[in-house]
A protein has these predicted regions:
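N-terminal DNA-binding module of tyrosine recombinases/phage integrases
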Residues: 1-65
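N-terminal DNA-binding recognition helix of tyrosine site-specific recombinases/integrases
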Residues: 43-46, 54-66, 73-111, 156-159
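Basic, Lys/Arg- and aromatic-enriched nucleic-acid-binding interface segment
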Residues: 83-85, 98, 102-158, 162, ...
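C-terminal catalytic core of tyrosine-transesterase DNA break-rejoin enzymes
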Residues: 98, 149, 153-160, 249-273, ...
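Short, polar N-cap/turn motifs at the start of nucleic acid-interacting alpha helices
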Residues: 168-175, 242, 261-280, 291
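C-terminal catalytic core of Y-nucleophile DNA break-rejoin enzymes
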Residues: 181-201, 210-233
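C-terminal secondary-structure termini that scaffold catalytic or DNA-interacting sites
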Residues: 201-205, 217-219, 296-302
Length: 302
Protein backbone atom coordinates (compact mmCIF):
# COMPACT_ATOMS: atom_id res chain seq x y z
CA UNK A 1 0.00 0.00 0.00
CA UNK A 2 1.03 3.62 -0.49
CA UNK A 3 0.88 6.00 2.42
CA UNK A 4 -0.04 9.03 0.27
CA UNK A 5 -1.33 9.64 -3.23
CA UNK A 6 2.22 10.39 -4.35
CA UNK A 7 4.20 7.10 -4.31
CA UNK A 8 7.47 8.94 -5.02
CA UNK A 9 7.24 10.49 -1.57
CA UNK A 10 7.76 7.04 -0.09
CA UNK A 11 9.94 5.49 -2.79
CA UNK A 12 13.29 7.17 -2.27
CA UNK A 13 15.43 5.12 -4.65
CA UNK A 14 19.15 5.64 -4.96
CA UNK A 15 19.87 6.08 -1.27
CA UNK A 16 22.56 4.14 0.57
CA UNK A 17 20.46 1.65 2.53
CA UNK A 18 16.92 0.68 1.66
CA UNK A 19 14.77 -1.14 4.18
CA UNK A 20 14.52 -4.18 1.90
CA UNK A 21 18.34 -4.45 1.92
CA UNK A 22 18.45 -4.20 5.70
CA UNK A 23 15.85 -6.97 5.91
CA UNK A 24 17.94 -9.16 3.58
CA UNK A 25 21.00 -8.64 5.79
CA UNK A 26 19.00 -9.38 8.95
CA UNK A 27 17.44 -12.47 7.38
CA UNK A 28 20.82 -13.86 6.41
CA UNK A 29 22.74 -13.04 9.58
CA UNK A 30 20.24 -12.99 12.44
CA UNK A 31 17.24 -15.15 11.59
CA UNK A 32 19.08 -18.49 11.82
CA UNK A 33 19.71 -17.94 15.56
CA UNK A 34 16.27 -16.60 16.48
CA UNK A 35 13.66 -18.87 18.08
CA UNK A 36 10.72 -17.55 16.09
CA UNK A 37 12.59 -17.33 12.80
CA UNK A 38 9.69 -18.32 10.54
CA UNK A 39 7.37 -15.81 12.16
CA UNK A 40 10.04 -13.11 11.80
CA UNK A 41 10.48 -14.02 8.15
CA UNK A 42 6.76 -13.65 7.39
CA UNK A 43 6.42 -10.36 9.24
CA UNK A 44 9.56 -8.83 7.76
CA UNK A 45 8.42 -9.85 4.28
CA UNK A 46 5.21 -7.87 4.89
CA UNK A 47 7.15 -4.79 5.98
CA UNK A 48 9.42 -5.14 2.96
CA UNK A 49 6.41 -5.25 0.65
CA UNK A 50 5.00 -2.06 2.15
CA UNK A 51 8.04 0.20 2.64
CA UNK A 52 11.00 -1.82 1.38
CA UNK A 53 12.03 0.88 -1.11
CA UNK A 54 12.41 3.58 1.55
CA UNK A 55 15.84 4.55 2.82
CA UNK A 56 16.07 3.43 6.45
CA UNK A 57 17.05 6.94 7.58
CA UNK A 58 13.78 8.25 6.17
CA UNK A 59 11.51 5.84 8.04
CA UNK A 60 9.72 7.85 10.70
CA UNK A 61 7.46 6.84 13.60
CA UNK A 62 4.51 8.29 11.67
CA UNK A 63 5.28 6.01 8.71
CA UNK A 64 5.19 2.96 10.96
CA UNK A 65 2.14 4.19 12.85
CA UNK A 66 0.22 4.64 9.59
CA UNK A 67 0.91 1.02 8.66
CA UNK A 68 -0.02 -0.19 12.15
CA UNK A 69 -3.39 1.46 11.79
CA UNK A 70 -3.77 -0.07 8.34
CA UNK A 71 -3.19 -3.53 9.81
CA UNK A 72 -5.66 -2.87 12.58
CA UNK A 73 -8.47 -1.41 10.48
CA UNK A 74 -8.11 -2.79 6.96
CA UNK A 75 -6.62 -6.19 7.69
CA UNK A 76 -8.60 -6.59 10.92
CA UNK A 77 -5.64 -7.97 12.81
CA UNK A 78 -5.83 -7.94 16.61
CA UNK A 79 -4.02 -5.29 18.64
CA UNK A 80 -1.72 -7.89 20.16
CA UNK A 81 -0.80 -9.14 16.67
CA UNK A 82 -0.15 -5.59 15.43
CA UNK A 83 2.10 -5.09 18.45
CA UNK A 84 3.97 -8.20 17.36
CA UNK A 85 4.49 -6.76 13.85
CA UNK A 86 5.93 -3.62 15.45
CA UNK A 87 8.12 -5.61 17.83
CA UNK A 88 9.69 -7.57 14.97
CA UNK A 89 10.42 -4.37 13.04
CA UNK A 90 11.84 -2.85 16.22
CA UNK A 91 14.16 -5.82 16.65
CA UNK A 92 15.44 -5.22 13.12
CA UNK A 93 16.10 -1.54 13.80
CA UNK A 94 17.71 -2.22 17.18
CA UNK A 95 20.20 -4.54 15.49
CA UNK A 96 20.87 -1.90 12.82
CA UNK A 97 21.56 0.71 15.52
CA UNK A 98 23.52 -1.27 18.11
CA UNK A 99 25.35 -3.90 16.09
CA UNK A 100 25.71 -2.55 12.58
CA UNK A 101 25.72 1.23 13.21
CA UNK A 102 23.55 1.74 10.14
CA UNK A 103 21.01 3.94 11.93
CA UNK A 104 21.22 6.58 14.62
CA UNK A 105 18.01 5.62 16.39
CA UNK A 106 15.13 3.15 16.33
CA UNK A 107 11.93 4.85 15.07
CA UNK A 108 9.82 2.15 16.75
CA UNK A 109 11.07 3.27 20.18
CA UNK A 110 8.83 6.35 19.93
CA UNK A 111 5.69 4.34 19.20
CA UNK A 112 3.36 3.41 22.03
CA UNK A 113 2.07 -0.16 22.02
CA UNK A 114 -1.64 -0.74 21.58
CA UNK A 115 -3.32 -1.74 24.81
CA UNK A 116 -4.04 -5.45 24.57
CA UNK A 117 -7.02 -7.26 26.06
CA UNK A 118 -6.30 -9.57 28.97
CA UNK A 119 -5.01 -12.87 27.67
CA UNK A 120 -7.27 -15.90 27.54
CA UNK A 121 -6.78 -18.78 29.96
CA UNK A 122 -8.39 -21.64 28.06
CA UNK A 123 -7.11 -24.91 29.46
CA UNK A 124 -7.94 -28.60 29.16
CA UNK A 125 -10.32 -30.21 31.59
CA UNK A 126 -9.24 -33.63 32.86
CA UNK A 127 -11.61 -35.34 30.45
CA UNK A 128 -10.45 -33.21 27.50
CA UNK A 129 -6.86 -34.01 28.36
CA UNK A 130 -7.54 -37.75 28.36
CA UNK A 131 -9.35 -37.57 25.02
CA UNK A 132 -6.62 -35.44 23.43
CA UNK A 133 -3.80 -37.73 24.55
CA UNK A 134 -5.73 -40.75 23.27
CA UNK A 135 -6.14 -39.02 19.90
CA UNK A 136 -2.42 -38.20 19.81
CA UNK A 137 -1.62 -41.88 20.35
CA UNK A 138 -3.56 -42.71 17.18
CA UNK A 139 -1.91 -39.97 15.09
CA UNK A 140 0.19 -40.88 12.06
CA UNK A 141 2.67 -38.30 13.33
CA UNK A 142 4.73 -40.45 15.70
CA UNK A 143 6.13 -37.46 17.58
CA UNK A 144 2.81 -35.80 18.35
CA UNK A 145 2.08 -37.63 21.62
CA UNK A 146 5.49 -36.87 23.11
CA UNK A 147 5.31 -33.24 21.95
CA UNK A 148 1.92 -32.73 23.62
CA UNK A 149 2.96 -34.59 26.78
CA UNK A 150 6.03 -32.37 27.03
CA UNK A 151 3.99 -29.22 26.39
CA UNK A 152 1.50 -29.99 29.17
CA UNK A 153 4.19 -31.17 31.59
CA UNK A 154 6.56 -28.25 31.11
CA UNK A 155 4.66 -25.18 29.90
CA UNK A 156 7.19 -24.74 27.10
CA UNK A 157 6.25 -22.79 23.99
CA UNK A 158 5.63 -24.64 20.74
CA UNK A 159 8.73 -23.29 19.04
CA UNK A 160 10.86 -24.03 22.10
CA UNK A 161 9.74 -27.66 21.98
CA UNK A 162 10.13 -28.19 18.25
CA UNK A 163 13.63 -26.68 18.22
CA UNK A 164 15.08 -28.67 21.14
CA UNK A 165 18.46 -30.07 20.21
CA UNK A 166 19.84 -33.12 21.98
CA UNK A 167 22.65 -31.08 23.57
CA UNK A 168 20.05 -28.99 25.42
CA UNK A 169 18.82 -32.00 27.39
CA UNK A 170 20.65 -32.48 30.70
CA UNK A 171 19.90 -36.07 31.68
CA UNK A 172 22.07 -35.90 34.81
CA UNK A 173 20.18 -32.98 36.35
CA UNK A 174 16.82 -33.74 34.75
CA UNK A 175 16.14 -30.57 32.83
CA UNK A 176 16.18 -28.87 29.42
CA UNK A 177 18.22 -25.71 28.85
CA UNK A 178 16.35 -23.05 26.89
CA UNK A 179 18.44 -20.20 25.51
CA UNK A 180 16.53 -17.00 24.80
CA UNK A 181 18.49 -15.24 22.06
CA UNK A 182 16.45 -12.05 22.35
CA UNK A 183 17.73 -11.16 25.83
CA UNK A 184 20.60 -13.65 26.30
CA UNK A 185 18.77 -15.37 29.15
CA UNK A 186 18.85 -19.06 29.93
CA UNK A 187 15.82 -20.88 31.30
CA UNK A 188 15.98 -24.27 32.97
CA UNK A 189 12.90 -26.46 32.45
CA UNK A 190 12.61 -29.39 34.91
CA UNK A 191 11.58 -32.60 33.15
CA UNK A 192 10.05 -35.68 34.77
CA UNK A 193 11.90 -38.98 34.86
CA UNK A 194 9.19 -40.57 32.71
CA UNK A 195 9.70 -38.01 29.92
CA UNK A 196 13.48 -38.25 30.13
CA UNK A 197 13.17 -42.00 29.67
CA UNK A 198 11.07 -41.44 26.52
CA UNK A 199 13.66 -38.95 25.24
CA UNK A 200 16.46 -41.47 25.73
CA UNK A 201 14.55 -44.23 23.95
CA UNK A 202 13.90 -41.89 21.01
CA UNK A 203 17.54 -40.80 20.86
CA UNK A 204 18.77 -44.40 20.90
CA UNK A 205 16.19 -45.61 18.40
CA UNK A 206 16.87 -42.82 15.90
CA UNK A 207 20.62 -42.61 16.63
CA UNK A 208 20.42 -38.87 17.28
CA UNK A 209 23.55 -36.82 18.02
CA UNK A 210 24.15 -33.61 19.96
CA UNK A 211 23.20 -31.13 17.22
CA UNK A 212 20.14 -33.06 16.01
CA UNK A 213 16.64 -31.83 16.73
CA UNK A 214 14.79 -34.10 19.16
CA UNK A 215 11.70 -33.63 16.99
CA UNK A 216 13.11 -33.50 13.47
CA UNK A 217 11.51 -33.66 10.05
CA UNK A 218 11.31 -37.17 8.63
CA UNK A 219 12.71 -35.91 5.33
CA UNK A 220 15.43 -33.64 6.69
CA UNK A 221 16.98 -34.01 10.14
CA UNK A 222 18.31 -30.47 9.87
CA UNK A 223 14.76 -29.11 10.10
CA UNK A 224 12.28 -29.24 13.00
CA UNK A 225 9.18 -31.36 12.59
CA UNK A 226 5.84 -29.78 11.63
CA UNK A 227 2.91 -30.85 13.80
CA UNK A 228 0.26 -28.29 12.87
CA UNK A 229 -1.96 -30.57 10.77
CA UNK A 230 -1.52 -33.55 13.09
CA UNK A 231 -2.43 -31.47 16.15
CA UNK A 232 -5.50 -29.98 14.43
CA UNK A 233 -6.68 -33.48 13.48
CA UNK A 234 -6.14 -34.73 17.03
CA UNK A 235 -8.27 -31.88 18.40
CA UNK A 236 -11.07 -32.82 16.00
CA UNK A 237 -10.93 -36.51 16.93
CA UNK A 238 -10.87 -35.63 20.63
CA UNK A 239 -13.74 -33.15 20.15
CA UNK A 240 -11.78 -30.41 21.91
CA UNK A 241 -13.11 -27.07 20.66
CA UNK A 242 -11.80 -23.49 20.78
CA UNK A 243 -8.28 -24.69 21.53
CA UNK A 244 -4.83 -23.78 20.17
CA UNK A 245 -1.44 -25.32 20.80
CA UNK A 246 -0.48 -22.31 22.92
CA UNK A 247 -3.38 -23.18 25.23
CA UNK A 248 -1.36 -26.21 26.36
CA UNK A 249 0.87 -23.63 28.04
CA UNK A 250 -2.19 -22.16 29.76
CA UNK A 251 -3.10 -25.71 30.76
CA UNK A 252 0.25 -26.16 32.51
CA UNK A 253 -0.06 -22.86 34.36
CA UNK A 254 -3.67 -23.56 35.34
CA UNK A 255 -2.85 -27.04 36.67
CA UNK A 256 0.04 -25.61 38.69
CA UNK A 257 -2.13 -22.83 40.09
CA UNK A 258 -4.88 -25.27 41.03
CA UNK A 259 -2.28 -27.42 42.80
CA UNK A 260 -1.36 -24.50 45.03
CA UNK A 261 1.98 -23.67 43.40
CA UNK A 262 2.94 -20.04 44.20
CA UNK A 263 2.42 -17.56 41.38
CA UNK A 264 6.09 -16.53 41.53
CA UNK A 265 7.12 -20.13 40.87
CA UNK A 266 4.69 -20.46 37.96
CA UNK A 267 6.09 -17.25 36.51
CA UNK A 268 9.63 -18.64 36.61
CA UNK A 269 8.59 -21.95 35.04
CA UNK A 270 6.83 -20.18 32.16
CA UNK A 271 9.65 -17.68 31.69
CA UNK A 272 7.37 -14.67 32.07
CA UNK A 273 9.28 -11.38 32.06
CA UNK A 274 6.98 -9.84 34.67
CA UNK A 275 4.78 -11.29 37.40
CA UNK A 276 1.83 -9.39 35.90
CA UNK A 277 1.82 -11.81 32.98
CA UNK A 278 1.15 -14.66 35.42
CA UNK A 279 -1.47 -12.90 37.54
CA UNK A 280 -4.29 -14.13 35.27
CA UNK A 281 -4.00 -17.52 37.02
CA UNK A 282 -4.38 -16.21 40.58
CA UNK A 283 -8.13 -16.80 40.68
CA UNK A 284 -7.56 -20.49 40.00
CA UNK A 285 -4.96 -20.62 42.74
CA UNK A 286 -7.14 -18.91 45.35
CA UNK A 287 -10.26 -20.90 44.45
CA UNK A 288 -8.54 -24.25 44.96
CA UNK A 289 -6.81 -23.13 48.14
CA UNK A 290 -10.20 -22.04 49.45
CA UNK A 291 -11.64 -25.43 48.51
CA UNK A 292 -8.80 -27.19 50.34
CA UNK A 293 -9.37 -25.11 53.48
CA UNK A 294 -13.09 -25.83 53.29
CA UNK A 295 -12.41 -29.59 53.26
CA UNK A 296 -10.23 -29.28 56.36
CA UNK A 297 -12.78 -27.07 58.05
CA UNK A 298 -15.64 -29.56 57.59
CA UNK A 299 -13.58 -32.17 59.41
CA UNK A 300 -12.49 -29.95 62.28
CA UNK A 301 -15.40 -27.59 62.87
CA UNK A 302 -18.56 -29.18 64.22
Amino acid sequence: IWLTKDPLTYSKLGRKYLLKDLIKKFTAERLPILKASEEYRRILFWWSEQIGEIDIKDISPSTIDHLRNYLLRNRRISKSRVNRYTAVLSSLFTTAVREWQLMESNPCSKIKKFKEPEGRTRYLSNEERRRLLDACKMSRNKDLLLVVELAISSGMRKNEILTIRIRQIDFDNGWINIYETKNDNKRIIPISAALLKKFQLKIDREKLVADDFLFHSERDRARPRCIRVAFTNALKIAKVEDFRFHDLRHTTASYLAMSGVPIQTISRILGHKTIQMTMRYTHLNSAHLREAIQKISTVIVE
